[in-house]
């Protein structure tokens, strides 16, 4: 069972969520780039690990640097070290329909975010219904949803693999290239199902940054909001 949150939640936002579920492993990148700015994540990861005693190891994935300095994080290991040596053969074991899959959280507008456990079978059936019947996603599609891994739409996007669709992922600001970055991706990546949060598209439209004439609708089907 796993859970995720976005780097923009900050240290306390992550602790408010992860502190309730007693995680044993914390995975983090050493940092990220947003709108041209390099943002370090190691100090935040160190604070999170110190605040949650259940965490046994912090696994760091290099992104800003090929060799991140891990000295300030106790229990830290590099992702590459987890892959070294003789690894056992990957085994897929049958699970029960109601076994837990991941934990999402409420918005936190009325206090600390509440944990919401999602089961394997129910989640897959619900997502498959929405992908197949509501969105008509198939193995011929290239599926994109602009979302962080802290929003439930990330989980919804990943389930598109069950429909055989190819997933297109984007890491960065939606307002790069004067607001055209995501729209340009439709042509560049041949995206057939494009979706984004209402606020990100509306902000660009209101600023008159996106012209409908810029979009090749022969490639992409109507967007999902």
Q: Where are the language model's segments positioned?
A:
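Generic beta-strand/beta-sheet core signal
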Residues: 5, 29, 61, 103, ...
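Conserved pre-ATP/AMP-binding loop-to-beta segment of ANL
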Residues: 59-60, 66, 71-105, 112, ...
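Conserved AMP-binding/adenylation subdomain of ANL enzymes
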Residues: 1, 124-142, 152-192, 207-209
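Short hydrophobic/charged patches on amphipathic alpha-helices used for structural packing
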Residues: 15, 92, 180-183, 212
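Gly/Ser/Thr-rich phosphate-binding loop
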Residues: 77, 165, 192-193, 206-225
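Hydrophobic, small-residue-rich alpha-helical packing segments that form membrane-like cores
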Residues: 12-13, 18, 24-27, 95-99, ...
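Structural core segment of the AMP-binding/adenylate-forming
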Residues: 1-81, 198-200, 218-222
